[in-house]
Amino acid sequence: MNFLKAKSSYEKAAKVQNWMGDRLCEKIPANKFFDQVFEFGCAQGEFTRKLKKKIIFKKYILNDILDYKSQDKVEIFDMNDIAQYPLSTQKFDLIASNATLQWLNFKKILPTLANMLDTKGILLLSTFGEKNLEQITKSTGFSLKYLSLFEIKKILQEHFFEILIEEDFITLEFESPLEVFRHLKLSGVNSLGHHTLTKTFLKDYEKKFQNKLTYHPIFIYVKKV
């Protein structure tokens, strides 16, 4: 991933991620009060601003692995190591994250998140499924190891009973194959590895995929009982 270089262009390019943030906020009643909120993977705060407008809260703690020099105080650390930090001993009635989970070891961090969640607390997450950016995977061979809807549900069922999972598919269309990869670059996602964008490669992409790019968002709403 390459989010810092794309900092100035990310919010404009990451239309799907912004839409996912809107979908997550729809799961929460307007003006619902939360005593303690923890959001991880906050990046430049696009989802943070949406969620803060939707709810009422006493304390809101932010995390990200990178320092974007935000005006808000952000705890900088790798969420894969959350169990090693004092924050993991606190209790929250809302833990949220938008379009971050795919970068993490979900099975590893979920027990800690479950312990951090207070009784009747809500876990509100979005990620991407196994068909995310499938055109890129087929054309370059490069991909993250995305979990399927079934795999995510199975992991959640080890710790929770009230589980709601939804998935969607969004296909974006571009004017040229070069625009597809420019979109990915501007949104901070490096899906090419060391692959070179030759004219032959771009023509082949256009022929096979008609300059389309598919996202596979997954939405998770869990309540601790």
Question: What does each model-identified segment do?
Answer:
Residues 1-29:
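Class I SAM-dependent methyltransferase Rossmann-like catalytic core
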Residues 44, 147, 164-225:
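Conserved Class I S-adenosyl-L-methionine
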Residues 30-36:
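Short helix-loop-beta connector
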Residues 85-95:
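A short acidic, Gly/Pro-enriched loop at the edge of an enzyme's catalytic core
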Residues 94-107:
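A short SAM/SAH-binding and catalytic strip from SAM-dependent methyltransferases
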Residues 124-149:
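Conserved class I S-adenosyl-L-methionine
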Residues 38-85:
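Class I SAM-dependent methyltransferase SAM/SAH-binding core
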